[in-house]
Amino acid sequence: MDTLVQDVRHSLRSLRRDWGLATLATLIVGLGIGASSTVFSVANALLLRPLPFEDPGSLVWIANNEWGRGQQLSSISVQVSHLWDLQNQSRLFSDVAGVFLFDRAGDFTLTGSGEPERLTRLRVTENLFPMLGVRPQFGRLFTPEDVTSDAGAVLLSHGFWARRIGADPEIVGRTLTINNTPVTVVGVLPASFDFTTIFAPGSRIDFVAPFPLNDVTNRQGNTLALIGRLQPGATMEAAQAEATAIAARPYEGDARRNEFVPRLSPLREHVSGGFRPAMILLTGSVGLVMLIVCANLSNLLLARGVTRQKEIAIRAALGADRRRLIRQMLTESALLAFAGAALGLLLALAGTQMLANSDASIPLLEQVRVDGAALGFTVLAAIVTGLVFGLTPAVSLSAVAFRESLKEGGRGQSEGKRRGWMRGALVVSEVALACVLLVGAGLLMRSFFRVLDVDLGFQPRGAVTLRIDPQTRPPTAAQRVAYFDEALRRVNAAPGVEAAGLTDVLPVAFNRRWGMRVGERRASPFVRMVSEGYLRAMGISLVAGRDFSVQDNDAGRPVMVVNEMLAQALWPGEDPIGRSVTLWHPEPWEVIGVVRGMRHLTPEQEPGPEAFFSIRQNRDYRAVHLIARGSSSLANLTSVLRDVLRPLDPNLPMNEFRVIQDIIDKSTSPRRFLVLLLAGFAVFALVLASLGIYGVISYSVSQRSQEIGIRSALGASPGEVQKRILIETLRLALVGTTLGLFAAWILARVMEGLLFGVTSSDWTTFLAVPVVILTVATLAGYLPARRAARLDPVVTLRADPRSGLVG
């Protein structure tokens, strides 16, 4: 212990004398460990830390793969009768609960308590929270009586309770007015349970209501997402086989039972498993960054060790054995590593807070934090980093000390060929690793820009939207149409408005499908209820036929507009205008128009079949969204819309205008999140590599000053000297870039699943990265080369005792 204390004291004195290098090393280690700890915290939240439920490992997501056998699992819903079957017939599930999927954001309006506000409801079966092990912070959970009574029992989300209710614990038992109907608050959910953070990132749930399981809700069709809990000892494979067998049994109830093809997966896999490839890429990237950090610091310590060669040789001559010298130098490295880890921990705290508050729609991202596991990782990273970057200089310098002892002590400024080769190899490795990161970041960045540039089939820029509802609830059909007519009349007459329309579904939102059949041809298009003017307001181009008009109402024949994909599916090679499809309506629905295919679900998903119905003829919607496009700024447009709509409905929340482009941008936030992180790592790696090149070339110039002086004295021009140094710089950069491009070529094939619109061998990226690296390397070597070209040969040779010019 005394020896360790002595080593620490000696190391502190040594680092204090060379405070500039110590500061630079601490900063480099801090940035590296800060990035590593931040990425570990994200990976821990998304993939490693248990979900905030009781025994989360036994929870199972039960999806219906009815519309996509063989495709990736999705949240396709199931029927109430399917839930009953699993509850009553399964031996491997201890419980199965459901979540209603068709409540949309803003379906409900809170009034009578300050400014009207749009609320979003979640409906769940009464047994969901007990099954998950969720306990209320205040009040109680739902009871079977809450499901059947008319009291309107609700649970408030913790966020809504804190934001709107002012965190008042006395809210339990009080009533709120939602959609002009009183509801009773029976409890407040805990902060640890945030449904949207886990299952619907980027959205918001304000209150929860019980979902009844009865014949009425069963006849509504596929409406539920199911979560089950396995019995102790039950396996996923056995549960899958049992659920498949139960779904295949004949059903004796309602003949209109939908098909159920159960697909089971661990709940954790459903929540965040889709982000595993991205997290593996980020983890690998931060590993490369740490290797560059270690190589850079090894180079710094090797350079510093040359100036300490005399000191080390004296200690060896005084009896210090090689093991003691190595331990002393490793102690210095450990101090630098732990100082950097302290800085890195502060950076990780700030980084995780920033990521948790970002708008990236990634499950569990809001729960990213520096916890005990992250602290342990930081300590481990400090230990490993200190050993890795300190071991090579320690072994190399101690070996030199024992070979040279005091004999070469006066030549502390010289550097042997072996150590020079080692420093060059470290720089080459830095350049190669930086090249790999730059190629990966470049491919993802190119993919991201391709996503932004994709033709959506509509024009999101310049359009805003607001959820509107008739004030009378529930409105009659006549009241609803009159309300919508007046809203559209006011908006279309407002100054600066170019087009306005209504729709029940916004872009990049959950939508429903309807099955359609023409002869033997089938299609399941997404459906939208829209008004006249909607196509113009969204910038959707008609390919054939006409748009909806005011005359397309209950008094007229049922009409619809289809997109090119649906037309091709039902009437391939034929003109769809005038064709008809029979649905539930006594009369067939006639096609009056064809529009281009649109990427309404995500910008990355190819357009699929869609059908549009007149909002005047179809009642299958709740509230609708007003969409307006204007010639003025978005701020002026929203101000004008507030002025014209407020007299129509004083209870209409006017602070919830949304920009259509913002909705599209939010859908790309996970990809933007990955691109920004990887680009940051790549830039950091490039900076470290350039520092490494600068350090090696600068040190090479200082150690070869006599050689340069002799060349200058023999007639070499400053330009020739500078050229020679730059060639040495580019040689290191070229070797590193060549190795890095080969490794990047392999990496690019691994990350193909994360790319969009570019190939893994994208020549633009693979050409641009070497240009960037060689340019940066040239700049890094320019200053040392210019200094070498300006050396005075007379002064240089006088400083060399072997030249005979001393004195």
Feature-to-residue mapping (PLM):
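Alpha-helical transmembrane segments of integral membrane proteins
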Residues: 1-22, 267-272, 300-327, 331, ...
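Nucleotide-cofactor and metal-assisted catalytic machinery
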Residues: 10, 22-24, 34-271, 353-366, ...
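Short, strongly hydrophobic transmembrane alpha-helices
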Residues: 18-46, 50, 292-295, 341, ...
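Conserved G/P- and acidic residue-centered "switch" motifs that form tight phosphate/ATP-binding loops
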Residues: 37, 139, 157, 187, ...
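Small-residue-rich transmembrane alpha-helices
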Residues: 42, 298, 334-405, 443-446, ...
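N-terminal membrane-entry
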Residues: 272-289, 373-377, 668-685, 727, ...
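Interfacial "coupling" helices/loops that link adjacent transmembrane helices in transporter permeases
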Residues: 293-337, 691-733, 737, 750, ...
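C-terminal transmembrane helical bundles of large multi-pass transporters
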Residues: 604, 640, 644, 650-741, ...
